[in-house]
Amino acid sequence: MHKVLIIDDEKDICFLISEILKDENYNTSIALNSDEAISKFKEIKPDLVILDVWLSNSKLDGIEILKEFKSINSNIPIIIISGHGTVDLAVKSIKNGAY
C-alpha cells in the first residue's frame, strides 16, 4: 500500500484529504507543523507528500520543508497546495522540485 504524508496546519483539510486517499486504498499520515512533518517524513518514508505552503504554527514554511525533504530524498514526489497561491510561489515551488 502506498504511503502519503499530508502536511497542513488545518486539521480539517488534512482529514478531508486523508479520507479521500484512504477510500482509494492509500495509507496516510498527517502532520500539522514543520517539526512533525520532518519527523514523520524520516520515520515513514512516504511515497508521496502533499504539502501546504503556508503553515501558521511552524518554524519553517512549506518551501523550506520542501528543500529539507529534497535534501533527505530527492526522489519522493511532493505536491504543493495553497489557498493563497501566486505565480511567484508556483515558480519557486517548481524550481525547488515540487509538482
Predicted regions and their residues:
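Two-component/phosphorelay signaling modules centered on CheY-like receiver
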Residues: 11-29
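Active-site beta3 strand of CheY-like receiver
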Residues: 44-50, 55
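Short hydrophobic/Thr-rich beta-strand motif most characteristic of the beta2 strand and flanking loop
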Residues: 25-34, 40
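His-Asp phosphorelay/catalytic-motif detector in bacterial-type signaling
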Residues: 2, 45-47, 71-77
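Short amphipathic alpha-helix used as the core "switch/output" element in two-component signaling
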Residues: 39, 54, 61-75, 92
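Conserved sequence signature across two-component system core domains
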Residues: 7-8, 31, 49
